[in-house]
């Protein structure tokens, strides 16, 4: 009889514990699992930056998940490999929206993948916070679930053209990779270069990745002061390398797609001295980045990639929005719609500075940087010389 009474007392104690301690129940159960997904290229030529986006998100979740766990929920990262391909990104997005536990997406790296994928997210009001997608279309569609912490290519192209004018460039030849991102930023550079009085003597796109002779031979004959490439480092590096090997002496300039230590890993000495604009300043230029870099290196045994810090900030904003949505739901699992509505309300002092979104999901003031490559050693990529830094508001939404 005493044994029965004792067991009864134990049962009552456990029941009371479940009532007074949030998230504690029989068997250590929680109120549920909240997932944050990433979409970025985790395989292929762009996997270095894509992995950096994933790891930035992972570090943010590990460091900042506390308030959501105290509310009784587990928090998990779910990484997806979009392979830098629009069809893969869309297929992944379809899979994401079927998992009701996924409350936010941090991604992508390629705007050409982000734009169609975000249309799928919109069907389920799954919020996307982009660390790296700079094409204006990303936010100019005014989708209620799409936001970004980085800048825009219409501004980046203008910044590049203004810099080229300062270099006394008279003639430029513009090449792009035929992607949504690469062609767009190349067009913005071309148009702004013309306004700045620079003669654009050629504009063409190519999907070639190994033999650029058919493009470079006529360029050598035209002898432009500048070659601008709109695209990603994996294609830009061999283009620039072959240009130098052909004896072309033009200056080189490109956008943030070139911002990777793999540029010098592929291009070596031939890309030393070239210029690039980026919407992701090296983390050393951010006052709050020192601790982030330390924790990143300790955790992953490697340096952060471009957009790792932006991914951390994007994830932090997602976590803040989820926390607010949980409170608004009385401590229950929030809806995706509720999370999406909370994201624009977040004002966050992040690694990359103060972050606040405008009505269409753009950062109210984004950073733009102009750098020069100083070494062929990939380990010294963060030592590249900062030439200019600007904080610029996005253009208003066109009616």
Regions inferred by a protein language model and the residue ranges of each:
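Extracytosolic ligand-binding ectodomains
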Residues: 2-399
């Amino acid at each position: 009889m005493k044994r029965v009474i004792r067991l009864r007392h134990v049962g009552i104690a456990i029941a009371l514990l479940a009532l007074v301690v949030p998230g504690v129940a029989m068997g250590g159960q929680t109120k549920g699992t909240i997932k944050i997904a990433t979409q970025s290229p985790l395989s292929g030529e762009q996997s270095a930056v894509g992995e950096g986006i994933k790891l930035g998100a992972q570090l943010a979740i590990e460091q900042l998940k506390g308030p959501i766990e105290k509310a009784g929920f587990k928090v998990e990262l779910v990484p997806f490999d979009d392979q830098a391909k629009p069809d893969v990104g869309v297929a992944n997005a379809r899979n994401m929206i079927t998992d009701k536990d996924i409350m936010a997406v941090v991604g992508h790296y390629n705007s050409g993948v982000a734009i169609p994928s975000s249309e799928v997210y919109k069907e389920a009001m799954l919020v996307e916070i982009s660390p790296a997608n700079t094409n204006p279309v990303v936010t100019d569609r005014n989708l209620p679930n799409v936001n970004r912490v980085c800048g825009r290519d219409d501004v980046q192209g203008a910044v590049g053209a203004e810099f080229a004018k300062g270099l006394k460039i008279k003639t430029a030849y513009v090449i792009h990779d035929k992607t949504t991102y690469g062609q767009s930023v190349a067009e913005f550079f071309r148009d702004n270069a013309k306004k700045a009085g620079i003669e654009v003597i050629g504009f063409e796109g190519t999907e070639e990745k190994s033999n650029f002779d058919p493009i470079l031979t006529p360029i050598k004959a035209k002898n432009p002061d500048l070659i601008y490439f709109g695209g990603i480092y994996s294609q830009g590096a061999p283009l620039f390398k072959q240009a130098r090997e052909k004896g072309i002496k033009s200056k080189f300039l490109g956008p943030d797609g070139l911002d990777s230590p793999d540029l010098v890993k592929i291009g070596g000495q031939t890309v030393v001295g070239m210029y690039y604009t980026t919407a992701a300043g090296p983390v050393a230029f951010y006052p709050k980045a020192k601790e982030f870099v330390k924790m990143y290196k300790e955790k992953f045994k490697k340096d952060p990639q471009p957009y790792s810090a932006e991914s951390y900030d994007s994830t932090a904003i997602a976590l803040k929005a989820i926390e607010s949505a949980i409170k608004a739901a009385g401590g229950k699992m929030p809806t995706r719609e509720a999370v999406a509505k909370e994201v624009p309300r977040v004002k966050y002092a992040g690694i990359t500075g103060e972050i606040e979104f405008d009505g269409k999901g753009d950062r109210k003031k984004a950073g733009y940087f102009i750098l020069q490559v100083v070494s062929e050693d990939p380990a010294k990529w963060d030592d590249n010389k900062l030439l200019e830094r600007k904080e610029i508001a996005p253009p208003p939404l066109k009616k």
